Amino acid sequence: MMMRFFTLLVLLCSTVQLQAQKATIRGNVFDKESAQPIAYATVQLDGAALGASTDASGFFTINSIPLGDYTLKVSYLGYDNVMLPISLRDGEVEYQAIYLEQGGEALEEVVISGYKEKAQNDVQVSKLTVTPKQIRALPSAGGDADIAQYLTVLPGVILTGDQGGQLYIRGGSPVQNRILLDGMTIYNPFHSLGFFSVFETELIRNVDVFTGGFNAEYGGRTSAIVDVQTREGNRKRVAGLVSASPFQIKGLIEGPLVKLKEGSDKSISFVATAKKAIINQVDDQLYNYVDGGIPFNYQDIYGKLTLQSGNGNKLNLFGFNYTDGVDFPATQFSWGSSGGGLDFQLLPQNSNTIVKGVFTFSDYDSEINDADNKPRSSGINGYFAGLNFISFGKDNEFRYGLELTGFQTAFEFENFRGVNINQTENTSEIGAFLRWKRKIGPLVIEPGFRLQYYLSLSDVYYEPRLGLKYNITDNLRFKAAWGLYSQNLLSTINDRDVVNLFVGFLSGPDESIFEPGSTTEKTENRLQTAIHYVGGFEIDLFKTLNLNIEGYYKDFTQLISLNRDKLEPEESDFIKETGEAYGVDVSAKYELRRANFWVAYSLGWVKRFDGEQTYPPVFDRRHNLNLVGTYEVGAKRQWELGARFNFGTGFPFTLTQGFYTNYTFDQGIGSDVLTNNGDLGIVYSDDRNTGRLPAYSRLDLSAKRHFRFSKHLRMDVTAAVTNALDRENIFYFDRVRYERVNQLPILPSLSVQLQF
């Protein structure tokens, strides 16, 4: 059935392609100095009133062009315009590699028109695009810009703490968010010191964050997608950087193995990066006022090799190794992740279709030794293979593909009642998808369909999706999305835990799962499922001020959780819950040549039902506000000032009713309960998560000075203050020791980065 479905997709899209008899221009726009792609450049065909914008990889296509002679004009702010004469014949598909030279000042209206064209022609519901420039502009801990810190200023995104915090997106837990790096699934993208991720900012090309309502090309998760794409190495010269701050040191090296030559688009290039934490070695000298120190240690290595053969064809080989460790007095936690793979892009001649493929594998292992609990360990490893096609017509765009996923999970855990839970499972999934984009006057529609087959469970899940946008006026647009989603991966995070360094992974259970509150009525399937509803408006108030308003509702129709209260071995290891998340996200962006301001506000509710009661999970935050501003000072903009303020209402927690002595009887009936001390057990309130922690607020400031010594040699010195007001934000309350544990206090820092 799966192969018949995919064959139908190919035949359908091939038929659409054969109907197109006019000419097509496609190509890539690059920076002439580094040969790096230029995203969102404006490409116009003078004489035909046709045009396009480049995507994140610098690619563009203009279809259904009448035959004749034209001038192709390419422009981008800060670059000289390029004008190319073009002659087109019937059925011709012409490829152009276009190189822009820095130094010109394209009109700001050109950039604005490029933005508006993209906004009017792309649905972009609940999609936020993040660039390295935006990440670097944010005041960051230690002066080290990182996507982990930038994600938290996006509407609908919440991080639960500076240390070991988890990322929650519009009511979805971390395991419901799929994090991708060049097509690879990254199971733990954030280090235990929550300021930093495994992704190197200088290596990022583009990050797409889908907070809900994503279309059919993404599957396997029920809440959100974070898609990180890295760039290729410099194709013309050897370059790099070194950086040092109180938190970490890092380096990057890149260059050509086969240099790009004039008149050719063929090259082989590489890029490699590494970073290592040093905060655990210097915290005693620099931050000795922090209770318990900052005992975090991590190391990240990533490398990429790119072969480009001309006409837009390329092959990437990549690999990574990430490690992390925490050494608290009562808790030792560590994890390691490694993987690699390849991806390719083919642009067949005289065809309106792009072929993309990816094959990756990855492995993740974690372990925790906690004085208050038994040791726990978890591992997940697997592979992913995908073949995707993009076919272009005049007002049509088809995306379709086939994917194969396989992974193994291993988890070992002993609950507080002494019952051991141990699971090792192998899982395989096949997915096929189709997304069709059609522009009809002011209306843009994107219906999609995904077929997800879970082989290990023998379950097929049909996932229709729909996105649309209606251009009410040039400055006002309505957009909406709807879709069904499923996944087979679940985690062991307990909703009672505000802080949990350890996250175990499991696949969907083979055993039967009962409906909430029932011991006889079984669920229809063993998948986690959800339905998304999103609607909102985009408003261009002025040329430089854009407002986005979105309301959303996520219906988590089935959530599978670990049964932590299991009493007997014959009881089920898993339970079913249901849930919902709903709210409104508002964001405004004001951009000038020297100044940028960003405001994001989220109002949200998250609820879960376990068969007995409806309760808010620990990441239910009612109000969340972020204010970000940057300003460039000086005749040559050599100074960059930044500020970020975050306010969030308190998270819920379950109140404590009392304590008791817990005897595990680990020696059986002969256990001595008279002279041996039992463990201290906690009696929780029957009403789950009815308490609320105090509100959170933090102000971060930064000042950066740029020094340029030559064309390629420059240095950035950044002074930053994290939690500048030294506010005592609560992290969690230690019930056993009856003491408050705060998040990190004021942390001033100075960092230096040298680029060559």
Where are these regions (language model features)?
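Surface-exposed extracellular loop regions of Gram-negative outer-membrane beta-barrel proteins
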Residues: 365, 455, 475-532, 551-571, ...
